[in-house]
C-alpha cells in the first residue's frame, strides 16, 4: 500500500514538473514571438515612412541634380562636378535601398547570390560617397590655402581625372577583397560576401575611420586659415558659402553613418572576444529592429544630400530657376507654334481630286 502511494506521489510530482516546464516553455515562446512581431510591425512602419517621405526626395532629387547640372555643362564649377558624382553614388544607393528597407526578417541574407550582390552595391556606393567627401574637403583646403594664386591641382581637367580615380578606387576597394574571399570560400554554396569578418573590419576602417581622420585634419587646417583671414573678409563670402555647404554634407554623412559603423564595430568586438560569433548576421539576428534602424539612417544620407545641395547651393538654385524658365518658355513656344500651324495650314479636303 505504501509503495502504491509513493508511486502515485512520484507520478503526480513528475507530471506537475512536466506541466510547469511545458508552461514555462510556451510562455517564453509566446513572449519571444510577441517581441518579434512587435519589432516587425515597428520596422515595417519605419520602412513605410522612409518609402513615402525620404525615398521620393532622394530618387527625384538626385536625378534633378544630374539633369540640371548636365544641362548647364558649360557653367559647371569644380565643386559642382564633385556633387554630380556624389549624386550618382547616392542614386545607386537609393535605388538599392528600396529592396533593403523591406528586408525585415533578414531573409535576403539566406540567398547567397542576392546577399553578395546587394553587399557589393552598398559597398561601392559607401566607398565612393566617403571618398568624394574626403576629396572635396581636401579640395576646399587647397582652394582656401591658395586663394591668392591659382593652384595647378584645381583645374577642371584634374577634377575629372580625380573623379575617375575615385570611382576606380571605390570599385577596387570592393572587388579586390571580394575576389580574395571568393577564392578562400570556393565551393561553399551558402557563402555570402557580407558575412565575412575581415570585410567588416575593412569597411569600418577604410570606409569610416581613416576618411574621417583626413576630413577632420582638413577642416582643422581650414578653420585655422579662416581665423587668419579676418582682415580680408571681403574676399571670402562665396568661399564661406561653399565651405558651409560641404561642412553640412559631411556632418549629415557622419550622423547618418555613425550608428551603422558603431553597430558593426560592436559586432566585430564580440567576434574578436568570441571567435565562434564571427558572422556578420549574428548581431542583426539578435537585434533585428536596431539593425534595421541603423540601415535606414545610413540610407537616409543619400536622400538628404539633394535637400542640402538645393538649399545651401546658391549656384544650383540659380541653375534650377534658369532650367525651369527654359522648360516653361519652350512649352509656351511649342504651344504657340502648334496654334500658328493650325491657323495657317489649310484643312485637308476629304474630296479627292480627279
Curated annotation (Swiss-Prot):
Name of a matching Pfam family: 7tm_1
Tissues where this protein is expressed: Expressed in oocytes (at protein level). Highly expressed in brain, heart, testis and ovary. Weakly expressed in muscle and intestine.
Disulfide bond sites: 115-192
Intracellular or extracellular location(s): Nucleus; Cytoplasm, Perinuclear region; Cytoplasm; Cytoplasm, Cytoskeleton
Example of a GO biological process term: apoptotic process
InterPro entries: GPCR_Rhodpsn (IPR000276), GPCR_Rhodpsn_7TM (IPR017452), GPER1-like (IPR047143)
Transmembrane segment boundaries: 41-61, 82-102, 113-133, 161-181, 203-223, 246-266, 293-313
Membrane-topology annotation of the record: Multi-pass membrane protein
Keyword hit for Nucleus: yes
Role according to the record: Membrane G-protein coupled estrogen receptor that binds to 17-beta-estradiol (E2) with high affinity, leading to rapid and transient activation of numerous intracellular signaling pathways. Plays a role in the embryonic development of sensory and motor neurons. May induce apoptosis and reduce proliferation of brain cells. Involved in maintenance of meiotic arrest in oocytes.
Family listed: Belongs to the G-protein coupled receptor 1 family.
Subunit structure: Homodimer. Heterodimer.
Protein name: G-protein coupled estrogen receptor 1
Species lineage: Eukaryota, Metazoa, Chordata, Craniata, Vertebrata
